[in-house]
């Protein structure tokens, strides 16, 4: 059973269908319904899954709390799901919150003092904990104790409270922003990687079954290959493709129906959407492939600088469509090919690694 305190995510102002973050509160509730409950149901992340199977089995045999767990990686890959699975496999409750919600030491103390033996406390966006709250967390993680201040002024005194043994599961998309003292207190650290197409197809097939949607193997594969390696995106695209199939394809999601539905949604075979293509086309057509500064690029496409840096660019850089250089953003040969264009002779002939395969 999970006990959740406050909303765990700040929703984007302009949701994209290929956004890796949740785009609505309703989507979060659907995710909970589709979430696997046990490690044997969890698809992908083989290394992390195998490690957790061993560590959980050992902790249960000893009757101890699992060591503290840090999960990091891009959004939408299953960090929250793994936290729930850990609690389920340990047979304990999960209490769920997020770094920005814990504004004062008392907020964290209230959670910690209400934990039962071996419970799991899940803190999403743990890199956003305030320093004063983080200080309270250190003795709780090491010694299962916290110090609280009673009274005010000269009469104030510190009281040490014992806590039940518990497991902290921290999740972050920015492991580099964690302080060293906090990072060092996690005994189990797992990085979640993007999923391959076969793994996503298995997830899509499972989700379709739970949604009572009729899907073929090639239909699941078509949804999977456009999902940018991210289960959250795969499940979102599946729901939209299901709607299309019910109206246009007699309810059956095959490769043709999935392809037509995703084309209607402007998600191309590589998973790029309108915003991705708008940025790449601006670099190629307006700036001759770059380099171009991010402020000039923002003005050219009518988007905020932060939107480009935080929302659009990461996927394009990770998958080789775009490079950041000291002089600005530059389109790679992959971009020119994707847009069906021939790169300038100077670009294709003398740019070294930018245009090498």
From Swiss-Prot:
Residues annotated as binding ATP: 34-35, 76, 79-81, 142-144, 185, 195, 232
Enzyme category, top tier: hydrolase
UniProt: DNA binding residues: 305, 324, 329
Keyword field: ATP-binding, Cytoplasm, DNA damage, DNA recombination, DNA repair, DNA-binding, Hydrolase, Nucleotide-binding
Ranges of Low complexity composition bias in the record: 1-15
Sites where the protein binds Mg(2+): 80
Listed CDD domains: AAA
SMART domains registered for this protein in UniProt: AAA
Catalysed reactions listed for this entry: ATP + H2O = ADP + phosphate + H(+)
Region (Large ATPase domain (RuvB-L)): 13-195
GO annotation terms (biological process): DNA recombination; DNA repair
Keyword Cytoplasm: yes
InterPro entries, per database record: AAA+_ATPase, AAA_lid_4, DNA_helicase_Holl-junc_RuvB, P-loop_NTPase, RuvB-like_N, RuvB_C, WH-like_DNA-bd_sf, WH_DNA-bd_sf
HAMAP family linked: DNA_HJ_migration_RuvB
Known function: The RuvA-RuvB-RuvC complex processes Holliday junction (HJ) DNA during genetic recombination and DNA repair, while the RuvA-RuvB complex plays an important role in the rescue of blocked DNA replication forks via replication fork reversal (RFR). RuvA specifically binds to HJ cruciform DNA, conferring on it an open structure. The RuvB hexamer acts as an ATP-dependent pump, pulling dsDNA into and through the RuvAB complex. RuvB forms 2 homohexamers on either side of HJ DNA bound by 1 or 2 RuvA tetramers; 4 subunits per hexamer contact DNA at a time.
Domain notes: Has 3 domains, the large (RuvB-L) and small ATPase (RuvB-S) domains and the C-terminal head (RuvB-H) domain. The head domain binds DNA, while the ATPase domains jointly bind ATP, ADP or are empty depending on the state of the subunit in the translocation cycle. During a single DNA translocation step the structure of each domain remains the same, but their relative positions change.
Family per similarity comment: Belongs to the RuvB family.
Name of the protein described by the UniProt record: Holliday junction branch migration complex subunit RuvB
Species of provenance: Bordetella pertussis (strain Tohama I / ATCC BAA-589 / NCTC 13251)
Source organism phylogeny: Bacteria, Pseudomonadati, Pseudomonadota, Betaproteobacteria, Burkholderiales
Record gene name: ruvB
